[in-house]
Regions:
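An N-terminal assembly and electron-transfer interface module characteristic of large anaerobic redox
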Residues: 1-247
Length: 247
């Protein structure tokens, strides 16, 4: 199949039975790469966890194997920023159909950040090619928009020193996220999990902390779903509508 399709890489993912049998997928990957000449690696899934773990390990492997060192070429985006030499390139990590649905939703996130002067370098991994993902080291900051992207963010930080923040651009929360991205680029020490810090410091809640009612009675709505996207949505709701939200 590899000789016919000629893929850019081969990823070997496990399932419960091979996992319990102790199948040596890294060794199989090594032999496969030697035989085909195609980059091959194992993704140690076992069918016993949710999609966040498996998809996260897949993006982690892409970051480990295919992202090239930062280019020394002048970044065109720097010419368009108010502050000379400031890099406004950003990677969005964890953009999957399971969390964001159609590609149009991902494009909406891009436009939201572009309104604050950011330029999207790559989206992991909807709508971009492997070639574009390989240029991720050129970005000034990574934004983890879902839990799936966290592993890749840590790899890119370790290999290239790229800082990351956690949060999805939703409503009025996008401004807070942009501020955290700017702080990360400038080297300021801020809380990585932006939506959590934003919610804890929200000043627009209608006397939520002053009420004598129990916490269960204070909550006006509950969001159920992936932690980063739901946490970001909760922060946006609290900021815009002053309504307490539980995730």
């Amino acid at each position: 199949a590899a000789s016919e399709l000629k893929p850019r890489f081969i990823a070997l993912a496990s399932s419960p039975i091979p996992y319990m049998n102790g199948t040596d997928f890294p060794a199989i990957a090594e032999v496969t790469e030697q035989d085909t000449g195609i980059p091959t690696f194992a993704v140690p899934t076992n069918g016993m966890h949710d999609y966040v773990r498996g998809a996260g390990m897949a993006l982690e492997a892409i970051a480990e194997h295919f992202v090239l060192p930062k280019s020394h070429a002048e970044d065109v985006s720097n010419k368009n920023t108010e502050e000379k030499g400031r890099n406004r390139l950003v990677n969005l990590l964890g953009v999957t159909p399971l969390d964001f649905g159609p590609l149009d939703h991902a494009e909406t996130m891009k436009r939201s950040l572009e309104q604050y002067g950011w330029q999207i370098n790559s989206m992991w991994a909807m709508g971009d090619s492997l070639d574009q993902l390989s240029k991720s080291a050129d970005a000034a900051v990574n934004v983890v928009v879902s839990s799936v992207g966290l592993r890749a963010a840590k790899v890119l930080q370790r290999k290239f020193g790229t800082p990351y923040v956690v949060g999805a651009p939703v409503g009025r929360f996008t401004e807070k996220l942009s501020e955290a991205m700017e702080a990360a680029v400038s080297g300021e020490k801020e809380d990585n999990v932006v939506y959590a810090a934003c919610r804890m410091s929200a000043e627009n809640l209608q006397d939520v902390n002053d009420t004598k009612e129990s916490p269960s009675h204070r909550v006006e709505m509950t969001l159920i779903g992936e932690p980063v996207t739901m946490g970001s949505l909760a922060a946006a709701i609290e900021l815009q509508y002053s309504r307490s939200v539980r995730v």
